[in-house]
């Protein structure tokens, strides 16, 4: 029986798997799988564990490879960043090197600037204005050039300018001579400060001229000769720009002369106001501009024509005190926008400042000028206003 089983076992051995690998035996009967339990089953579990370990090892190896690939991929970008940083460092080093190269020139510029400052201070005290202005202009140009820290070619130009400047300063008078000149100027300034102002002298001279003209019309010959002699003396004294004591004497003589003259006649007719050789009449009634021109002509006068800033201030004060709108002899009737006085003279550009704000505006054919508040205004010529007449002063005797 054993002999019969042995060939069967060998035949089955051809169909049996290794129990260490699968733990399953195949039988030709019914061609089905049959699992053998017991210790054969334990051996199959151990086979599965080895597979799991192999799978885990493979996954770990794959993770390591992925990590290596990631690190390797970062290397080019890191190298590129490192290269750009090196370029930036190199550029900064180049700029620093250039800046260091300019430091020596900067110290030289500071030296030049100090010399220029000293020269400017010295020249600023000198009295020769034309020469000083030329030097000061050169100093200003040099200072501006030095302040800009110029390049080397500019430095050479500055050195040349500085050399010429030093030569120019060397031609100026020495300090002791300057002090002498300055003292002389100080004395002259003090002396001039004691003299009467030019406007005051002109006023005195004008009054003297007017008095002389008025005296010429007086009938008493002996009295006229006496007054004329005093006028001649006063005129000569004023022409010599006398010192303060002489001025007081002139003022006293002038006062006495005016007092004596006023005993003989008045400057202006009754109800007229005298100012700087002229007589002014401020009306108490109102007329339009054309009738105001006629009213002044009837008394041998003229609707006021303003010649000086002093006269304007005087008249503006008179009208503002009385709070009256008063006609003056100014209009643009001949040509719109071209203002003329009644004597035919044009309005001076310097008088444009006397118009009130926004005037003249020609609102409703306003062609005639009036005193209004603190300035001038244009108004319609047919409006009734007060008016001001003007004529030269003369001798008017009391009746």
UniProtKB/Swiss-Prot annotation:
C-type lectin domain span: 274-390
GO cellular component: cytoplasm; external side of plasma membrane; extracellular region; host cell; membrane; plasma membrane
Glycosylation, residue list: 92, 361
Entry keyword Cell membrane: yes
Transmembrane segments: 50-70
Sequence repeat copies, ranges: 108-130, 131-153, 154-176, 177-199, 200-222, 223-245, 246-268
Pfam families cross-referenced by the UniProt entry: Lectin_C
PROSITE patterns per record: C_TYPE_LECTIN_1 (PS00615), C_TYPE_LECTIN_2 (PS50041)
GO biological process: adaptive immune response; antigen processing and presentation; cell-cell recognition; immune response; innate immune response; intracellular signal transduction; intracellular transport of virus; leukocyte cell-cell adhesion
Keyword Iron recorded: no
InterPro entries, A to Z: C-type_lectin-like, C-type_lectin-like/link_sf, C-type_lectin/snaclec_domain, C-type_lectin_CS, CD209-like_CTLD, CTDL_fold
Topological domain spans for side Extracellular: 71-399
Residues engaged in binding Ca(2+): 359, 361, 363, 366, 377-378
Keywords: Adaptive immunity, Calcium, Cell membrane, Disulfide bond, Endocytosis, Glycoprotein, Host cell receptor for virus entry, Host-virus interaction, Immunity, Innate immunity, Lectin, Mannose-binding, Membrane, Metal-binding, Receptor, Repeat, Secreted, Signal-anchor, Transmembrane, Transmembrane helix
Tissue specificity statement from the Swiss-Prot or TrEMBL entry: Predominantly highly expressed in liver sinusoidal endothelial cells and in lymph node. Found in placental endothelium but not in macrophages. Expressed in type II alveolar cells and lung endothelial cells.
Motif, Endocytosis signal: chain positions: 14-15
GO molecular function list: calcium-dependent protein binding; carbohydrate binding; D-mannose binding; ICAM-3 receptor activity; metal ion binding; pattern recognition receptor activity; peptide antigen binding; signaling receptor activity
Cytoplasmic face of the membrane: 1-49
Functional summary from the UniProt entry: Probable pathogen-recognition receptor involved in peripheral immune surveillance in liver. May mediate the endocytosis of pathogens which are subsequently degraded in lysosomal compartments. Is a receptor for ICAM3, probably by binding to mannose-like carbohydrates. (Microbial infection) Acts as an attachment receptor for Ebolavirus.
Subunit description: Homotetramer.
Domain notes: The tandem repeat domain, also called neck domain, mediates oligomerization.
PANTHER family with a match to the protein in the record: MANNOSE, PHOSPHOLIPASE, LECTIN RECEPTOR RELATED
Protein's UniProt name: C-type lectin domain family 4 member M
Organism, as annotated: Homo sapiens
Designated gene of the protein: CLEC4M
């Amino acid at each position: 029986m054993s002999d019969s089983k042995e060939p069967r076992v060998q035949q089955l051995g051809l169909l049996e798997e290794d129990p260490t690998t699968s733990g399953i035996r195949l039988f030709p009967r019914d061609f089905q799988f049959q699992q053998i339990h017991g210790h054969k089953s334990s051996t199959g579990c151990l086979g599965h564990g080895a597979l799991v370990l192999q799978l885990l090892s493979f996954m770990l190896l794959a993770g390591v490879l992925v990590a290596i690939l990631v690190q390797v991929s970062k290397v080019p970008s890191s190298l590129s960043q490192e290269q750009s940083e090196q370029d930036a460092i190199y550029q900064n080093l180049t700029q620093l090197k250039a800046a260091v190269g300019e430091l020596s020139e900067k110290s030289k510029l500071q030296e030049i600037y100090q010399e220029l400052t000293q020269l400017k201070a010295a020249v600023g005290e000198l009295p020769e204005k034309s020469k000083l202005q030329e030097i000061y202009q050169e100093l200003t140009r040099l200072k501006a050039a030095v302040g800009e820290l110029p390049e080397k070619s500019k430095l050479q130009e500055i050195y040349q300018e500085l050399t010429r400047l030093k030569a120019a300063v060397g031609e100026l008078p020495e300090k002791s001579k300057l002090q002498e000149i300055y003292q002389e100027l100080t004395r002259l300034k003090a002396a001039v400060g004691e003299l009467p102002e030019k406007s005051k002298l002109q006023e005195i001279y004008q009054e003297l001229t007017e008095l002389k003209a008025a005296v010429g019309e007086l009938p008493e010959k002996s009295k006229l000769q006496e007054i004329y002699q005093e006028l001649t003396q006063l005129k000569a004294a004023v022409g010599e720009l006398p010192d303060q004591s002489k001025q007081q004497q002139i003022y006293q003589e002038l006062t006495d002369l005016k007092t004596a003259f006023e005993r003989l006649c008045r400057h202006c007719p009754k109800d007229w106001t005298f100012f700087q050789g002229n007589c002014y009449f401020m009306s108490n009634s109102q007329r339009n501009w054309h009738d105001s021109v006629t009213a002044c002509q009837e008394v041998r006068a003229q609707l006021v024509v303003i010649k000086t800033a002093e006269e304007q201030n005087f008249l503006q004060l008179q009208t503002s005190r009385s709070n009256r709108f008063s006609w003056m002899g100014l209009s643009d009737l001949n040509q719109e926008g071209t203002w003329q006085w009644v004597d035919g003279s044009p309005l001076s550009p310097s008088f444009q400042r006397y118009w009130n704000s926004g005037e003249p505006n020609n609102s409703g054919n306003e062609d005639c000028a009036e005193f209004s508040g603190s300035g001038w205004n244009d108004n319609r010529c047919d409006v009734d206003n007060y008016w001001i007449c003007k004529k030269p002063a003369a001798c008017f005797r009391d009746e």
